Amino acid sequence: MVKLVFARHGESEWNKANLFTGWADVDLSEKGTQQAIDAGKLIKEAGIKFDQAYTSVLKRAIKTTNLALEASDQLWVPVEKSWRLNERHYGGLTGKNKAEAAEQFGDEQVHIWRRSYDVLPPNMDRDDEHSAHTDRRYASLDDSVIPDAENLKVTLERALPFWEDKIAPALKDGKNVFVGAHGNSIRALVKHIKGLSDDEIMDVEIPNFPPLVFEFDEKLNVVSEYYLGK
């Protein structure tokens, strides 16, 4: 059986401050750095050997991937970065305190923006300091592809081609794969892998730690699913 390990990035500075992060390139907190190292230790203890790793183009996921691979003595494993594994784009909510947003827009509205499958938050202004339209890491993309806001549905739509073109073929080739990504990009892929309904995915949470493991048969049917260390 092949294994796919999802590691959500460790706690970021904005997680710690309770801010909507999305595509903002925020660093790991001290706690988050340790979580990434501990994730690697759990991987080593479990004896999981990787052949390929994938991550987003955001530093909190990149650092988590590198720290986890280093702690599991697998820093040599090839790592491919893709914007398609980025966190969901929180649009105009980016940088806002979650509690303050609830006060401004109402608890129910913010809950809908955060947890619904297909409701978009307000768009981010193109001149916002966190806008991806002027970010060099997305310079190769057509401007029409770069989002101003995303819901989970849109997040899955842009992550799914990466699953179909990269992750799934690697697994079918018998490779164990590490994916260092984000809460919502992982949720989106979990929805696809498990065939969850739009309502079912609303209750799925992906913690910063520990890593989530899927084991597949040769046809990519899920054989088992578990969190390391639990």
Swiss-Prot record:
Keyword Mitochondrion (UniProt): no
Superkingdom field: Bacteria
Catalytic activity reported: (2R)-2-phosphoglycerate = (2R)-3-phosphoglycerate
Active site, per annotation: H9, E87
One Pfam assignment: His_Phos_1
Top EC category: isomerase
Site (Transition state stabilizer): H182
Pathway of action: Carbohydrate degradation; glycolysis; pyruvate from D-glyceraldehyde 3-phosphate: step 3/5
GO biological process, one term: glycolytic process
Record EC number: 5.4.2.11
InterPro entries: His_Pase_superF_clade-1, His_PPase_superfam, Phosphogly_mut1
Key words of the record: Gluconeogenesis, Glycolysis, Isomerase
One GO MF term: phosphoglycerate mutase activity
Positions contributing to substrate binding: 8-15, 21-22, 60, 87-90, 98, 114-115, 183-184
Alphabetized HAMAP family for the sequence: PGAM_GpmA
Functional note: Catalyzes the interconversion of 2-phosphoglycerate and 3-phosphoglycerate.
Family note: Belongs to the phosphoglycerate mutase family. BPG-dependent PGAM subfamily.
Protein name per UniProt: 2,3-bisphosphoglycerate-dependent phosphoglycerate mutase
Organism from which the protein derives: Streptococcus pneumoniae (strain CGSP14)
